[in-house]
Swiss-Prot record:
InterPro entries: NAD(P)-bd_dom_sf, Sc_DH/Rdtase_CS, SDR_fam. Keywords: Plasmid. It holds the Pfam family adh_short_C2. PANTHER family: 3-OXOACYL-[ACYL-CARRIER-PROTEIN] REDUCTASE, CHLOROPLASTIC, SHORT-CHAIN DEHYDROGENASES/REDUCTASES FAMILY MEMBER. It comes from Xanthobacter autotrophicus (strain ATCC BAA-1158 / Py2). GO terms for biological process: fatty acid elongation. GO terms for molecular function: oxidoreductase activity, acting on the CH-OH group of donors, NAD or NADP as acceptor. This is Inactive 2-(S)-hydroxypropyl-CoM dehydrogenase 2. Signal peptide: none annotated. The keyword Nucleotide-binding does not apply. Belongs to the short-chain dehydrogenases/reductases (SDR) family.
């Protein structure tokens, strides 16, 4: 995602709970990137990280909220602690990062926010109660933000990826041991005949951040190989 943004001409701030990881990734990208550690569920930490990014790179014009965690469990089996953790990272994290970014965007009357949902926020997936609920909340929050802020120069959209097999999330969904039968069953749900790639998802987000999407706001952008079409 960050590399795609830099290729498009942007400067990027990478914020991760693991500060060393964020700094290492930024160093690998080069001078156009800056990395810092912050927990998206900590309001003070994420606000400080945003302020640091603006000092390092200049005014914030785009935000990608792609911090997220998944988990497995039905309503009757999910522990309250698991439910709370999934909601905190996926929903509260999106809220807090957006809140931190919006003050400057509103002052400048310019900005684009891309939230990350999931096909799990659009359709029901067995044994993923908390994750489906969290990503559904992100979709609804995106629509609310678009309705409220688009007239003030700030567009808000949500990308809802299908399975991306090469990511940690994709490996969770397919099983750590890449069960061929499970993979085949999941693949059968994708009319395009393959799972997504990180590049597929990144290019969708970069489009929504760009001026090419100047008339796009409140959009639920399913990047899912047709999964939700059937």
């Amino acid at each position: 995602m960050a590399r795609a943004a830099v290729r498009a001409g942007a400067k990027v701030a990478l914020i991760d709970r693991d500060g060393a990881c964020a700094e290492k990734a930024a160093a690998e990208i080069g001078a156009a990137a800056w990395g810092v550690g912050a927990d998206v569920t900590d309001e003070a930490a994420i606000a400080a990280a945003m302020a640091g990014a603006e000092r390092a790179l200049g005014p914030l014009t785009g935000l990608v909220n792609n911090a997220g965690i998944a988990g497995f469990g039905s309503v009757h089996t999910t522990e309250v602690e698991t439910w709370g953790r999934i909601m905190a990272v996926n929903v509260t994290g999106t809220f807090l990062a957006s809140k931190a970014a919006l003050s400057g965007m509103l002052e400048r009357r310019r900005g684009a926010i891309v939230n990350f949902g999931s096909v799990a926020g659009l359709v029901g997936i067995p044994s993923m109660a908390a994750y489906c609920a969290a990503k559904g909340a992100v979709v609804s929050l995106t629509r609310q933000m678009a309705a409220e802020y688009s007239g003030q120069g700030i567009r808000v959209n949500v990308v809802c990826p299908g399975t991306v097999a090469s990511t940690d999330m994709g490996r969770q969904l397919l099983g750590q041991d890449a069960d061929p039968e499970l993979e085949a069953r999941r693949l059968a749900k994708y009319p395009i005949g393959r799972f997504g790639t990180p590049e597929d998802i990144a290019e969708a987000a970069i489009f929504l951040l760009s001026t090419k999407a100047a008339f796009v706001t409140g959009c639920v952008f399913a990047v899912d190989g047709g999964m939700t079409a059937i």
